Amino acid sequence: GIKTLDGFDWSWPKKINRALLQQVFRLDFLPQHGNVILLGGVGVGKTHLAIALAHTACLQGKTTLFTSAVDNVNALAAAQATGGIKREMARLLKPSLLVVDELGYLPIDKFGADVLFQGISQRYERGSTVITTNRAFKHWPEIFHNDSTLTSALLDRLLHHAESIVIEGPCYRMRDQSDA
């Protein structure tokens, strides 16, 4: 089924700022081109909430694009190889809301770090971005090819108008596993 905020199991996360999350779902950040970072371990509901945010934006008539960080980088790499990088970058810049899922789950090479930086930089104050990640900000240089200068610049733009929501708890998908 469609992921919604109503379908989110609030009893599962050990820690989540429910009031802030509900405020974010009013989408007041979209007209201001703000961003949302959903930060937490594996299986705590980040992707569910990101999909639900995108769905809510669609219901309000906003253009939305959902992609994983790796798919995003791969699409840009393929576009670079065929001379279509400007067109692919434009596709990422066009929607009111861009959701980048799973940033930090897999390492990104220098090209990937550079193009992700370009995309987020170009969206700065022009469009909203939601990012799900399992990495604390202090570990983001590891995502971006250990380029601390690029990472600092990226975080500066991303966090300037952003709400960061930390979700803590065990993996929801493992809730039915016994301790046998």
Language model region names:
Residues 1-19:
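Charged, amphipathic alpha-helical linker segments immediately N-terminal to NTP-binding catalytic cores
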Residues 16-94, 143:
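Conserved P-loop
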Residues 97:
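Walker B motif beta-strand of ABC-family P-loop ATPases
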Residues 1-3, 31, 160:
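A generic structural signal for short, non-catalytic loop/turn and secondary-structure boundary residues
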